[in-house]
């Protein structure tokens, strides 16, 4: 796991949405540093949202970003439940269809970028439509 820089002395508490947005920006920058290209953020389709859509070569990468202050209760990566995976798969399916694609025609994968405290973990191909 890599360490993420933090800012100390923050004058106010962020809302849950602001915190999520902050970590999504961190994840985007971190993935761009690893060579992925940004496509979209906060993509909403019927009943679901994908935090980031990136490209790695010819592969479309759907990214779920998670943050937990500590590893208590399993940390950030453990919070991507089966139910959440199903919702992400459905949202990606709809997004692909809107862009004239499908899981059969587009090379894609589902990654998780999990921030636990100041540590970042990138789980490539964390789950798929055959899970």
Swiss-Prot record:
Q: Could you tell me which species this protein originates from?
A: Escherichia coli O139:H28 (strain E24377A / ETEC)
Q: Which family does it belong to?
A: Belongs to the UPF0102 family.
Q: Which Pfam families match?
A: UPF0102 (PF02021)
Q: Which CDD domains match?
A: PoNe_Nuclease (cd20736)
Protein's name in the database: UPF0102 protein YraN
Q: Which domain of life is it from?
A: Bacteria
| Example of a GO MF term | nucleic acid binding
Ranges where the record places region Disordered: 1-20
The record's annotation in HAMAP family points to: UPF0102
Q: Which InterPro entries match?
A: Restrct_endonuc-II-like, tRNA_endonuc-like_dom_sf, UPF0102_YraN-like
